[in-house]
């Protein structure tokens, strides 16, 4: 029996990889998707299931959980093979132009590869205060999985970017009170959400920096705050702390692969067809760079069909490729 060779292997099961999977299915490409986590969704599904996502056209204020559920529903219309809980350890390009994909579980082959790894492995930037580690997972968290955990609680959110603002606005309707502690007077969020924040009941503690925390009992925590460029101090007694200082990420595993991919600032460089410096290897999502690139889910949704269509034309140059899903006769 001849060895199976896929047309396409998608590495990464975040939103961009999921949408690429759907488009491979639409074009009836023999494809597989490999994801290291035991479920699809990537960072959006793992870290922000309750957070509102606003940059997806036609889906205002969809939660991360609901967005991933919709993408899974879409993938089921034109399914491809999925291998979850499997980390790709190496990708090797052979002399015949095909690729060998190695994981700890198996070895497979493919005629083309789409890398959709986002920013790679991600870990939250931790609150560097004595005692913070001891209450992590109790009074202190780095992301919000369930809004109900914050119902009728006094909550302090530490941070000043888009995600911190989104969390504050998300918890405002359910929490007893919400404080947003930021070391600057200005916030780094989108103008519209900053306006919403200023019109909300969220209490803005700026420009303050947390200097110490004290666990008063098994339930509450006191935060000692120091005003920037001043000797003024303040205290907050809260039930819950959410730290949102961003995440550190890396694609260290990618650097171990037997591929020579041109990169810039640890991002994979691609051309207008989303192809990398290695022919047959495409890359999409937050882990790529090109002139004008914006790191948004919406951008990844545009890059996925670009990559799939480009590689499909190369693999099957004589096949007429329908460009619009409305012309493909799809039925649910």
Curated annotation (Swiss-Prot):
Record flagged with keyword Amino-acid biosynthesis: no
Lineage: Bacteria, Bacillati, Bacillota, Bacilli, Lactobacillales
Gene3D superfamilies xref list: FAD/NAD(P)-binding domain (3.50.50.60)
Taxonomic superkingdom: Bacteria
KW Flavoprotein (keyword) present: yes
Co-factor remark: Binds 1 FAD per subunit.
Keywords attached to this entry: FAD, Flavoprotein, NADP, Oxidoreductase
Single GO MF annotation: NADP binding
Catalytic reactions on record: 2 reduced [2Fe-2S]-[ferredoxin] + NADP(+) + H(+) = 2 oxidized [2Fe-2S]-[ferredoxin] + NADPH
One Pfam family of this chain: Pyr_redox_2
Family designation: Belongs to the ferredoxin--NADP reductase type 2 family.
This protein's name: Ferredoxin--NADP reductase
PANTHER family, sorted: THIOREDOXIN REDUCTASE 1-RELATED-RELATED (PTHR48105)
InterPro entries linked to this entry: FAD/NAD-bd_sf, FAD/NAD-binding_dom, Fd--NADP_Rdtase_type_2, Ferredoxin-NADP_redctase_2
Subunit and interaction comment: Homodimer.
SUPFAM superfamilies: FAD/NAD(P)-binding domain
Enzyme class: oxidoreductase
Residues holding FAD: 35, 43, 48, 88, 122, 286, 326
């Amino acid at each position: 029996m001849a060895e199976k060779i896929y047309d396409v292997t998608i590495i990464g099961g975040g939103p961009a990889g999921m949408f690429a999977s759907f488009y491979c299915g639409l074009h009836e490409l023999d494809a597989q998707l490999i994801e290291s986590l035991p479920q699809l969704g990537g960072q959006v599904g793992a870290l922000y299931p309750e957070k509102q996502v606003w940059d997806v056209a036609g889906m205002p204020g969809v939660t991360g959980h609901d967005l991933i559920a919709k993408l899974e529903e879409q993938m089921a219309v034109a399914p491809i093979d999925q291998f979850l809980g499997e980390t790709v350890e190496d990708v090797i390009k052979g002399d015949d132009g095909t690729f060998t994909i190695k994981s700890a579980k198996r070895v497979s082959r493919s005629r083309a590869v789409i890398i959709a790894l986002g920013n790679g492995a991600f870990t939250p930037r931790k609150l560097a205060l004595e005692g913070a580690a001891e209450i992590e997972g109790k009074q202190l968290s780095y992301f919000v999985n369930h809004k109900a955990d914050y119902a009728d609680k006094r909550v302090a959110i530490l941070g000043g970017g888009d995600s911190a603002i989104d969390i504050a606005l998300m918890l405002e309707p359910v929490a007893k009170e919400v404080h947003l502690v930021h070391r600057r007077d200005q916030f780094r969020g989108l103008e519209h959400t900053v306006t919403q924040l200023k019109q909300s009941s969220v209490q803005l503690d700026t420009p303050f920096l947390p200097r110490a925390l004290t666990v008063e009992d098994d339930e509450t925590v006191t935060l000692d705050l120091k005003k920037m460029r001043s000797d003024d101090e303040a205290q907050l007694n809260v039930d819950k702390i959410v730290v949102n200082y961003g995440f550190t990420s890396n694609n260290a595993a990618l650097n171990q692969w037997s591929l020579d991919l041109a990169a810039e600032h640890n991002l994979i460089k691609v051309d207008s067809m989303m192809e990398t410096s290695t022919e047959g290897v495409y890359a999409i999502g937050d882990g790529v760079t090109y002139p004008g690139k914006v790191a948004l889910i919406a951008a990844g949704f545009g890059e996925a069909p670009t990559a799939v269509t480009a590689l499909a034309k190369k693999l099957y140059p004589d096949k007429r490729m329908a460009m619009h899903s409305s012309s493909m006769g799809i039925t649910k």
